[in-house]
Amino acid sequence: FIRYIFEKLAGFQHQDNRQESVVEQIKHYINDHLKEDLSRKTLAGSVYLSEDYVSKIFMNVTGISIPSYVASCRMQKAQEYLKYSTFSVSKVALEVGYSNFSYFSKTFRDYTGCTPNEYRNRVTKKQG
């Protein structure tokens, strides 16, 4: 009986490791393709699994949804571009996967508490 319990626990551990591995693959894909469409279908296809399963394990492993993770990665990358590049704000929006500048600005403001231009002005003042 004890052996059976250990075998079951080992199976769960293996499943957890597999899920974590899949989530890491998805995270890498997201970070390598921020400029592109990152729909559930695209991400599921990148790891050859169903959309529902990918969404479920991503939430189980990370505690956040895929769209929330994608938005967070895009906003972090946008902050880097605004701080270290001379790209226009509209170019930054395109580089992080937003074709709609207004939506990018609203999302950025919601994420950081300021507009992209305000953010750039703040961080360049601190550097100067």
Predicted features along the sequence, with ranges:
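Short hydrophobic/aromatic patch on the recognition helix
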Residues: 54, 58, 103-104, 108
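Terminal helix-turn-helix DNA-binding modules in bacterial transcription factors
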Residues: 24-28, 32, 37, 60-99, ...
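Conserved short strand/loop->alpha-helix "switch" segment adjacent to the catalytic nucleotide/phosphoryl-transfer site
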Residues: 17-18, 36-42
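Flexible loop/N-cap segments at domain edges
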Residues: 11, 18-22
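Residues within helix-turn-helix
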Residues: 41, 52, 88-91, 101-102, ...
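…primarily DNA-binding HTH/wHTH and HhH modules…
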Residues: 106-128
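An amphipathic alpha-helical interaction segment
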Residues: 1-14, 53-55
